Amino acid sequence: MGELREFVSPLHRATKRDYLARMNDDKVKCMLKAKEYAFEYWDGDRRYGYGGYEFRPGYWYPVAKSLIETYNLKSGSKVLDVGCGKGFLLHELLILEPGLLVTGTDISEYGLSHATDLVKPHLIKHDARGEFKWGDKEFDLVISLTMIHNLRAFELENCLRQIQRIGKSHYVTAESYRNELEQFNLQCWALTCETSFDFDEWLWMFEKSGYTGDFEFIYFE
C-alpha cells in the first residue's frame, strides 16, 4: 500500500461550513439536484454544491507543486485526472510544467465545458463507473481528487482497479471520518457521496481492489 499524503487537506480545512444548515435545507432535494452535476452543482446556490466554482489563479498551486515534486513529473510525463471537474488542478500543473501531457476526465459536460482555455483541449467526458480505455501503465501518474466516494462500493472497487492498472504511480483523495462527530458532519454536508467509509474501511477497500497507490482523506471537523 502507498503512503498517506496531505496535499489537499490544507485547502479543505480553510473552508468554513455550517453543517446543520446544510442538513436542514431540504437536503434530499438538494442531493438530487447536485447529482445532475450541471449548473446548479458547480455555479448555482451553495445549497446544491460549490456555490460558484470559478478559476482562482494560484489556488491549486500548492497541490500541483506537491504532485510535481513527489512524483518527479517533468516534460513528457503523462498525467490523468479522473473526475477532474473543470480541470483547474491540471491548469496549475501546466503552468508549472508546460511540457506535461495531461488528460482530464469527468462525467459532467457542464464542468468540462467551463474549463480554462489552457486545459479544455485535454479534457474528455468519461464515466468512472465504466471501463477505462487506456493501456496498462499508460500514465506516469493517475490522480483522482474527491471523486471516488461518489461511486457505489462495487463501482468504486472497479474504478480503483482501473486506476491501478493504467498508472505507474497513483494518488487518490476521498471523504472520510475518524469519529462520530466527523461522521455526523459528513452526513450533514455530503450531497453526492455514495460510499461513506472510515479510515480502516478505506484501507480495506484499497486492499480488496488491489490499489497500491498513495491516498489522502479529508475530514469534516
Which positions does each model-derived feature cover?
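Hydrophobic adenine-recognition pocket in adenosine-nucleotide-binding enzymes
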Residues: M147
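Class I (Rossmann-like) S-adenosyl-L-methionine-dependent methyltransferase catalytic domain
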Residues: M1-Y71, K78-G135, L151-R165, S169-E221
